[in-house]
Every structure is written in C-alpha cells, then in structure tokens.
A protein has these predicted regions:
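Beta-rich ligand-binding surfaces for carbohydrates and other polyanions
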Residues: 2-269
Length: 269
C-alpha cells in the first residue's frame, strides 16, 4: 500500500474536490459524488475468505507506471494496458458513469467508453473479482452525509449488497464505524459504532414479532424488508430499468442504491 507520491497531484485533487482517502487498502468502491479516486500507487483489496465467504482474493492496483491492473485469486485477470503512458496516473469515475484513468495533470489515457445520464455513479471491485460500474443512484437513505473514521482500516468487511441476495437477521453491511443491521425485531438500522450509544443514523422503523425477517434487493433496484416468508414490511419504492443493482454503505454514512450495471469487465449473463 503506497501513498500519493506527487504533491502537485495532491493539490490538484484537493482543488477539484477529489477525496483520495490514502490508506484505504481494504476499500473497493470509487464514487463520482462526492468524488473519490484510486491514486498513483494505491490499491484496492478485497478478501472475504477469513469470513468464510468462498471467493478468491481480489485487488485492483493503480501502478506507478500508469497501468491499472486487476488480480483475482493470485492471477492477473485484466488491465488497461496503459503502461508508460504517463506519470502519477489515477482512476476516477465521472457524473456520466465513465471510468477514466488520467495522467498528471488531466490528460485521459484510458476510458471505459460507456456513458449514461448525469447522476451519481459507483465503480466497484465486485464480489466475483470483476469490475463493474453501477448507476445512476436511484435511492438514498435520508440521513445527512458525513465523514467516516479517517483511520485506515485493513480489515475487509462487506459493504455492498447485490441484487438476487437475501440476508436474514444480523449484520448486513459494515464500513469502518458504520454498520447496517437487521435487528431481531425486524427494524433495519444504520448505526455509528464509534459512539457509546451506537447512534442510529437511519432506520426503517419496521417491526415484526415473528423474528423471521430478511432483506432483499430486486434486480430493478428496489430494497425490501420482508417477514412471514414474503410479506412486505418496508420497501424503498424506487426502481430502474435494470436486471442488476447494488446497495452500497458509503464512506459518508449514506446507504445508496445504484443501478443498472453500466459497464463491466465480464458480463454476468
Ligand atoms: C482460487 O485458486 C485456488 C487454488 O489455485 C482454486 O482451488 C480455487 O478454485 C480458485 N477459486 C476461484 C474462485 O477461482
Ligand atoms: C490488454 O491486453 C491484453 C493482452 O493483449 C488483452 O487481452 C486485453 O483485452 C487488453 N485490455 C484492454 C482493456 O483492452
Ligand atoms: C475507447 O474509445 C477510444 C476512442 O474511440 C478508443 O481508442 C479506446 O480503445 C476505447 N477504449 C476501450 C476500453 O474500449
Ligand atoms: C492490520 O494492521 C495492523 C497494524 O498495522 C497489524 O498489526 C495487523 O496485523 C493488520 N491486520 C491484518 C489482518 O492485516
Ligand atoms: C413506499 O410506499 C408506501 C405506499 O405508498 C408508503 O407507505 C411507504 O412509506 C413508502 N416507503 C418509503 C421508504 O418511502
Ligand atoms: C439483462 O441482461 C441481459 C443479458 O446480458 C442483457 O442483454 C440485457 O440488456 C439486460 N437488461 C437490462 C434491462 O439491463
């Protein structure tokens, strides 16, 4: 894990509001809004095998030689092939959903070449070791955005939930000091675990005495809290024309649903 090497680049990124989050070794999402970047020499890393989730280790590395390289389960699986095209190259995603590798200062050396309407987008190192761009955002929790614990964490936790997943009572997602939990009484709550009282930042205010609830995300991006096998306790009510979406617990404490999948290194179908 390396840190940004170029002061001019840092100033540039700050000038343009890009939040680099050095030390984000176990992160695996880049956002268009508020913007984040994978900076020169930085790497994303994803490994849930210690938590008995049987996918291989994945990493995405913005190499100092300007090549953006994806590794999965020990092998190189994809690259932008931009070696030697510039110095201080970094990866961002823009408000049209296009991923761009730029060299110092702003010259693009690689683009994903798929654009969509203006909105908020997320670039994910996915659970299966592939890359995916999702958006625009179709739903967001109503709490105020804020900055998470600035301390870097090297513990991988899962903070993305995909369509076709079903999760029972318990921890749903965790990002640093933020945790989304489906409680035993069927209330879906977003907590700040840094506070003694575990402040609730957002909740569905749902209740069921049956202790059998679960959450699902439909392919069209609608999030549900259900119980009694399939009865709906809560729904997000926003949908998009999509067959695959992602719910992300972002670094600013907001839950956001992005869909459809606009670009990927390997289609699911
Ligand atoms: C990862 O590599 C190991 C050892 O080479 C192999 O047994 C395993 O099936 C691979 N996992 C995936 C998801 O490809
Ligand atoms: C990079 O080069 C490899 C090997 O030539 C090729 O298979 C791959 O498609 C290229 N990547 C991109 C993004 O074009
Ligand atoms: C994107 O489009 C440019 C210009 O047409 C082309 O040179 C480049 O190879 C394309 N990139 C990908 C990843 O397809
Ligand atoms: C995380 O970082 C700390 C301090 O650098 C180190 O002691 C610990 O072993 C690391 N844990 C993992 C799982 O890498
Ligand atoms: C979704 O719509 C239902 C029915 O109109 C409404 O009762 C519920 O409050 C809405 N949910 C949200 C999260 O807005
Ligand atoms: C759903 O997946 C199929 C198969 O890849 C694809 O052709 C189609 O465009 C997708 N539909 C939507 C609405 O995204």
């Amino acid at each position: 894990m390396a840190f940004p090497t170029s002061v001019p680049l840092l100033i540039l990124l700050l000038t343009f509001g890009l939040l680099g989050r050095p030390g984000s070794a176990t992160d695996f999402v880049i956002y268009s809004d508020p913007p984040t970047a994978l900076l020169p020499g930085q790497m994303f890393h994803y490994d849930l095998t210690p938590q008995d989730i049987p996918y291989g280790r994945a990493s995405l590395v913005m190499k100092p030689d300007c090549n953006l390289v994806l590794y999965f389960n020990g092998s190189k699986t994809w690259a932008t092939n931009t070696t030697g095209l510039g110095d201080n190259c970094y990866l961002t995603i823009d408000s049209h959903g296009e991923a761009i590798v730029q060299r110092n200062i702003h010259y693009p050396v690689w683009r994903s070449n798929k654009t969509s309407v203006v909105g908020s987008y997320a670039f994910l190192l996915q659970w299966n070791g592939e890359l995916g761009i999702y958006g625009p955002a179709i739903w967001s929790s109503s709490n105020e955005g804020e900055l998470s614990d600035p301390k870097p964490s090297n513990i991988t936790t899962d903070y993305v939930f995909y369509s076709y997943s079903v999760l029972p009572i318990g921890k749903i997602l965790e990002y640093k000091n933020y945790r989304l939990v489906l409680r035993d009484d069927c209330n879906l709550v977003l907590l700040d675990t840094n506070t003694n009282t575990q402040d609730i930042k957002w909740q569905t205010n749902t209740y069921s005495p049956l202790h059998d609830c679960f959450i699902t995300l439909d392919p069209n991006g609608e999030l549900f809290v259900k119980h009694n096998r399939r009865d709906i306790l809560w729904r997000s009510n926003e949908t998009t024309n999509s067959n695959f979406s992602a719910l992300v617990l972002r670094y600013d404490a907001k839950l956001v649903i992005y869909g459809p999948q606009l670009w990927t290194t390997k289609p699911l179908w």
